[in-house]
Amino acid sequence: MAMTVEEQKKLERSLIERGKTDLAALDDGFEIARLLGDHEIGNEIRKLAMEHLRKGGGADATMLYHRSLIFDGPMNFDCFMRALEFNRPVNEQFWLPRRKQLMPISNALQDMEDGKLDELFLSQPPRTGKTTLMVMFLLWIMGRNSERSNLYCSYTDSVVGVFYNGLLEILNDSYTYAYGDIFQTKIASTNAKDLLINLERKKRYASFTGRSLYGTLNGACDCNGYCIADDLHSGIEEILSADRLKSAWDKVDNNLIPRLKMGAKMVWEGTRWSIADCIARRIDLLENDQKYVDHRWKVVNVPALDENDESNFNYSYGVGFSTEYFQQRRASFEHNNDMSSWYAQYQGSPVERNGMVFEPGGMRYYNGVLPDGEPDRKFIAVDPAYGGGDYTAAPVVYQYGDDLYIVDVVFDNGEKNVTQPQLVAAVKKYDV
C-alpha cells in the first residue's frame, strides 16, 4: 500500500533527524524530499552534509551536498550559482569568493523572480562583478522558463556582444559549468549578428535578445520576461552634456521601455552618474508620480568604501579590491581635482551632489567689460564647506537678460572663521 504524502513527510523528517549522525539516513531523507518536490528542507540537508564532511564523510557527503544544490538550483538563484560552478576550483569560481558581499544583490534578484518586486536598481563600482552576476541571473531565468523573451540593452554593441558571449560560454562549456545538470534545456539556435539565443525551440521573439540603446529596438523583442538595462551612458563626457542625457532618456522612454509587455520585470544597473541620467529619471518618476504608487521597486547601491572607510569588495582568494586599493583610487581622483567622478563611479552618488565637473571648452568667457547699464539681477551663490579639506565656493553673479557674468568668486578651503568674513566682504562690495 502506497504511503500518503503526510506519511512521506513524517518519514522525511525522521530520516533527516537520524541524518545528524547517519549519512545514509540523511541521503534517504533527501531522496524523499526530492520525490516530494520539497525545496524547504535543502538548507538543513546541506548543513548536515557539511558536518559529515568535516567528520570525514568524504565523497558521499560531497555528492549529497552537490545533488542538493542541483535539486534546489531551479528554484533558488544562490543554489543555482553554487551548483553551476561546483566542479571548478574555488579560487577560479565567480560566485563563492564574492558570495558574502554580493548576497544582498542576489537576494534582491531572487525577490524579483519570487514576485515580490517589479523593478530593481543596482549600482556598484567598476569590475566588482555586476555584469557577470547578471549573466548568471539571466541564464537562471532562461532555464526556468525558456519561453519567456528577455532583453539586454547597453549603450554600445560591443558591450552587448560581450554579454552575449558570456551567456554562450556557460551554455556551451559543460566541462567547466554544470548548467545541463540543473536545467535540461538545449540551445535551439543562436545568431551572433543579431545577438539572439533560443533555448528549446526557435521562436519569433528569442529567449535572449541583445541590443544597444542606439540600435534597432523597435520590433526586435517583445519582452515578457526581464529587461536588463546595463550602463546606458558611455561616461563622463556624455554626462556633461544635457542634450546627450536627454537623448539617452528619450531612447529609453520611447524605444526601450515600450518593448516590455505587462508583467515583464526591469533591472537597471550601472554607474549613478547624474541626477538627470536614465536611472535617476526613472527613480524620480516612481517616487513622485501617483500612478506608480503600487509599483514595487528597490534600490541596492553598494559603495566601494563603507562608512568606516573600509572596502565593501575585499573578496576571498584575492579576486576583489582592498581598502588600500580604493583609497588609492580616491587619492588619484582627489589629486586631479575630480572627486565628483570618484563619488559617481565608486560610491554611487551622482556628480551634482559632490560638485559638478565642467569642461573648460564648454564655458564662455568675457574680457572683463560688462554690458552697458545696470544688471537685471545681482546675486551670490554659496556652496559652503563642512571641513575635511573641502572648499567654500561662492561666485558673485551679474545677470543681463539670459546671460550670467561671474565678476568675482570666493574660493577657499579655510575654516569658517576665514571664509565667513570673505563672504561678508563680497556681499558688501558688490551690494548683493
Question: PLM features: residue spans?
Answer:
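ATPase catalytic-site recognition across NTP-hydrolyzing enzymes
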Residues: 309-382
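N-terminal accessory segments
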Residues: 1-117
